């Protein structure tokens, strides 16, 4: 269920501070975060955020199309190796 409009989007306060400092200084440094639950806001557009996927940090360059989505949507946590297949050769 989506968050109530009267509450507004959730952004980790520490992450918001880092984003505001990066915007003021026009820094292109990567901002590392564990906060996958934070919503992408327009102030983040143009920044690169390294989002933790449980094992490592994956760089995510934020574009206008990502505004309103969560950071975790762009950092997959699971690796799909394919379904277990039939090991026998198939026909001639």
Swiss-Prot record:
GO terms for biological process: ribosomal small subunit assembly; translation. One of its GO terms (cellular component) is cytoplasm. Keywords: Ribonucleoprotein, Ribosomal protein, RNA-binding, rRNA-binding. Pfam families: Ribosomal_S19. InterPro entries: Ribosomal_uS19, Ribosomal_uS19_bac-type, Ribosomal_uS19_CS, Ribosomal_uS19_SF. GO terms for molecular function: rRNA binding; structural constituent of ribosome. The keyword Protein biosynthesis does not apply. It comes from the Bacteria. SUPFAM superfamilies: Ribosomal protein S19. The keyword Repressor does not apply. Belongs to the universal ribosomal protein uS19 family. Protein S19 forms a complex with S13 that binds strongly to the 16S ribosomal RNA. NCBIfam families: rpsS_bact. This is Small ribosomal subunit protein uS19. It comes from Desulfatibacillum aliphaticivorans.
